[in-house]
Amino acid sequence: INANGTLDASFAPGTGFNSGYVADIVVQPDGKVVASGTFVNFAGTAVGRVVRINPSGVIDPTFNNGGAGANNWVLALALQPDGKIVIGGSFSTYNGVAYSRILRLNTDGTPDASFVASANNTIYDLLLIGSGVFVCGNFTLVNGTAAIRGVMLNASGTIDASFYSTTGANGV
């Protein structure tokens, strides 16, 4: 869709998302779209629940080039100002490596080893606040520490002690 709301005829995604659904999208400054969800294919290509699409509608082959992606749903995305993307959901691996429901991707779609976090249950939403990320979900532990359904993480993935509650919400 163009900025004025009209259909962009140059966007040609082929068959698009072949299975599952899209749960979240972010648009990068260069016009590329990153989508996440329960889908495993885009335009007939396996994408592992996260895909970056060029403005023309075709898969960006430089994003997570050849990686398997997430082994389960990716329900939330948060695009950082530096172009890195925090993802959350119900996955336990990304590209065959163990990650428990949250990780940050580099600009090329590969895992960012400088962000280390985990949750014991599904993450449903992410919100960037300053240099950190607020995480909401159905979890009771984050990084092995009691964090009931909501927690603020620092840029490294550690719990922000200035915004921390062990009682949390009754449901998010």
Residue ranges and their predicted role:
Residues 1-172:
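Extracytoplasmic mature domains of secreted or surface-exposed proteins
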